[in-house]
Amino acid sequence: MIAIIDYGMGNIRSVEQALKYIGAAYIVTSDKEEIFRSDGVILPGVGAFPKAMDILEEKDLVRVLQEIGRSRKPLLGICLGMQLLFEKSEELQDCNGLSLLPGVIRKLKVPYKIPHMGWNELKKEGEIALWNGVEDGSFVYYVHSYYADCPNEIVYGISDYGVKVPGFVAKGNIYGAQFHPEKSGDIGMQMLKNFKGVVETWKSSQLSI
């Protein structure tokens, strides 16, 4: 069972439809016990970083997500949800994030239209489980005005938008997509299927303990 975190700022409907399409068992929840009982977690998000962190704090979900991230349970952040995984953001004001990944969220300063909206090429950097069946140079769908300034060793996908935008990051059990896999057609569905596979592998490992 995958828990989609519902905190009032997520693109939950489209994520829910995508999981339904790939045949994944899921629950939409903000209940701490349901999140802990899940086999994997998706943190979606659309909106401002400081407001999102305030809401997560109010719902006591910061602690929950940090515990999930520091365990081996698979966690996938999408768009703002990915940005929240980092140490802090410069959006509107300096604001601390979940600190599960090293790096800072900074505003895009490029000679192009902001937000970065639409399809862009994703160049793979290294191999991870979520790349199974995903061709290098596939196009994915973005909507964002901020990007992660983070160490190269956690960057597994890059798009060019005047700067090198980390499109996909990963460290251990933690994954983050700056783009929207649920809106990225067959390629996005394949990535979500791969995440489902990672979740199932983790679940099986727990049953054997």
UniProtKB/Swiss-Prot annotation:
Alphabetical UniProt keywords: Amino-acid biosynthesis, Cytoplasm, Glutamine amidotransferase, Histidine biosynthesis, Hydrolase, Lyase
GO cellular component, one term: cytoplasm
Source organism, top-level taxon: Bacteria
EC number: 4.3.2.10, 3.5.1.2
Subcellular location as annotated: Cytoplasm
GO molecular function, a single term: glutaminase activity
GO aspect biological process, one term: L-histidine biosynthetic process
Record-linked CDD domains: GATase1_IGP_Synthase
Keyword Amino-acid biosynthesis set for record: yes
Catalytic reaction(s) noted: 5-[(5-phospho-1-deoxy-D-ribulos-1-ylimino)methylamino]-1-(5-phospho-beta-D-ribosyl)imidazole-4-carboxamide + L-glutamine = D-erythro-1-(imidazol-4-yl)glycerol 3-phosphate + 5-amino-1-(5-phospho-beta-D-ribosyl)imidazole-4-carboxamide + L-glutamate + H(+); L-glutamine + H2O = L-glutamate + NH4(+)
Active site: 79, 180, 182
Pathway it works in: Amino-acid biosynthesis; L-histidine biosynthesis; L-histidine from 5-phospho-alpha-D-ribose 1-diphosphate: step 5/9
Annotated Glutamine amidotransferase type-1 domain residues: 1-205
Record's function text: IGPS catalyzes the conversion of PRFAR and glutamine to IGP, AICAR and glutamate. The HisH subunit catalyzes the hydrolysis of glutamine to glutamate and ammonia as part of the synthesis of IGP and AICAR. The resulting ammonia molecule is channeled to the active site of HisF.
Assembly with partners or alone: Heterodimer of HisH and HisF.
Protein name (database record): Imidazole glycerol phosphate synthase subunit HisH
Organism: Bacillus anthracis
